[in-house]
Amino acid sequence: MNVIDQLEREQMRMDIPAFRPGDTIKVHLRIIEGEKERIQVFQGAVLRLRKGGVDSTFTVRKVSDGVGVERVFPMHSPFIERIEVVAQGKVRRSRLYYLRALRGKAARIKTRTAWD
């Protein structure tokens, strides 16, 4: 086993739940401002997953006050307190960039049921 592979394996988090594009998740972030520390929650739909070991990222989109906000999170970041899966979405694409152009009810994602 390579030394680099061993270091990457040590830095990977094992407490991340399984989620896919289309799922609605809550990302609890640890924000450090000066000497204060607080938790900020970012809830939205997963647009994409990029798997690459320690370098894995995922993009979450939410609409805040009528403005679309997208944020890219490193999967194994120490600033992520936890990730909660709120709802599982039923989509047929792995990249949901088409949601950027949709507004209102058209931007909704169907929920996945147990037999889907």
UniProtKB/Swiss-Prot annotation:
UniProt xrefs under Pfam families: Ribosomal_L19 (PF01245)
GO cellular component: cytosolic large ribosomal subunit
Keyword terms of this UniProt record: Ribonucleoprotein, Ribosomal protein
Biological-process GO terms, alphabetical: translation
Domain of life (superkingdom): Bacteria
Bilayer-spanning residue ranges: none
InterPro entries: Ribosomal_bL19, Ribosomal_bL19_sf, Translation_prot_SH3-like_sf
Molecular-function annotations in GO: structural constituent of ribosome
Keyword RNA-binding: no
Family: Belongs to the bacterial ribosomal protein bL19 family.
Stated role: This protein is located at the 30S-50S ribosomal subunit interface and may play a role in the structure and function of the aminoacyl-tRNA binding site.
Protein name: Large ribosomal subunit protein bL19
Taxonomic source organism: Solidesulfovibrio magneticus (strain ATCC 700980 / DSM 13731 / RS-1)
Gene assigned in the entry: rplS
